[in-house]
Amino acid sequence: MQTIIDFIREIDKLKSVERKTKPLGLQRFENSAEHSWQLAVMVLSLSRFSAVPIDVLRTVKMLVLHDIGEIDTGDTIVYATEIREQRKEEELLAVQRICGLLPAELRDEFLGLWTEFESAETAEAKFAHAMDRSIPIILNLANNGQSWRENGIRYEQVIGRNGPAVASGCPALWAYLKEKLDEAQGAGWFV
C-alpha cells in the first residue's frame, strides 16, 4: 500500500507542471494534471466518433498517465520539433522512475500503457493522440489563438503537426477543427 501512496503523492506534482495554453476565462496557464483530466473527459464524450471502435477505459488510462514524465522534464510545446528525440529519451527515464515507485504488476501495466501511447499504433493510442493534439486547438480557438500568438505559431505548423494525428484517430473531429482553423487563419490568429 505504501508504495502506491508514494506514487500517488509523486504524481500530485503534475499539478505544478505549467503548459502553454490558458484555461478558458483564466489568466494563468493550465497545468498537466488539468490537461490529463480534460482529455479523459474528451474520450468519454467523443469516443463514438473514433475512426474504429476503441476500449474507452484503456484509452482513458492511457491519457491520465501519458504526461507523468513531465514531472521531471516539464512540458514542451508540440511545435518544438528540434528537441523531440531528446525529450522522448528524458521522458522515458522519468516515467520509468515514477512508475518504479509502484509494485511490479502496476508498474508494468502503467509503463505498458505509456509505451502504447507513445507508439501510437493501436486504435486506442491513435484516438488518445487525436484527443491530446486537439485540445490545445480547441482552447486556442476559444482564446483567439492565445498560445499560437504568444509562441509565434503558424497555421501550417498547426495543420502539419496535428492534422494527421487527429484525422487518424477521430476523422470527424479533424473535419470540424480544420474548418475552424481555416476561419482562425482568416481572422489573423496566426503569425
Locations of the language-model features?
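Alpha-helical, largely C-terminal catalytic domains
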Residues: 1-191
